[in-house]
C-alpha cells in the first residue's frame, strides 16, 4: 500500500500546492480521491503512470475537486487505456459526467462505469472494501473510508516446529483450513495469527459533523481537511469547512493513529500555523 499526495490546496492552487488529489495504490488497484485541476501533471511529477488509476472517488462537484477529470480521461484515451475506469460520486454524478462529455470533444472514449453513492459500502472484494458517508457542505458531498480485510499470516517459527514443508499445506492453513501432517491434525490457530487490516479515512470540505467521526473511526491514517487555522473558525463555518484544530479533534475522538492535513487555503504560504493548531490537540 502506498499513498501519494498529489495536491493539498483548496480552491486556489499555489506555486507550491496543486488542487486536491490523493492517490492510494493497493496491489492492482489505484484509487484516486478527488481530481483537482492539474492532477495528471502531478502524476507525471510523482512518476506514477495514469494507467494505474482504476477508481476515482469524487467527494463533491465543486471545481477544485473535479477540474482535472476531463484532462485525465482524455489522456487515458490517448494511451489506449484497456481497463474499466470506475467513477464514484454523490447523487448527480452521472448527469454531470454526461454534461462533461457534451462540453468537450473526446476523439476516443474509454470504458467508464459511473456510479452514484449515498451511504455505506460502495465496493468490496476479498482484500478490501470502500465506504462512503454524507458530509455537510451545502451540496451533495461524501467522505470515504478504505478498509483492508484482516489477513491470516503464517508464524514461520511454529511452522518449523511442526516441520511443515513449503507448499500447498501452508496455503491451506493460510486459508483458515486444518491440515493433516505426519499423522497429526494441525489447526490454523496453532501456526497462524491474524494481522489487522489498515483503515484509511478521507474527509474534506465539511463542517464538523457526526459522520466525520464515523469515517475516521479507528483509522490508521486520517486524511482530513484543514482549510483554516483556529483563528478563522467563523470563516470556516461560514464557508462549510473545518479548521486544523477541528481536524485534530476528530482524530482524537475517533482514535485515529495518524493525521495528515490537506485542503489548505491559499492564504497560508506555509503550513506551520495549521500544524501547530493540530499538534496542540493531537
List where the protein language model places each region.
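Conserved beta-strand hairpin/beta-sheet module of binuclear metal-dependent hydrolase folds
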Residues: 1-46, 82-84, 144-146, 192-203, ...
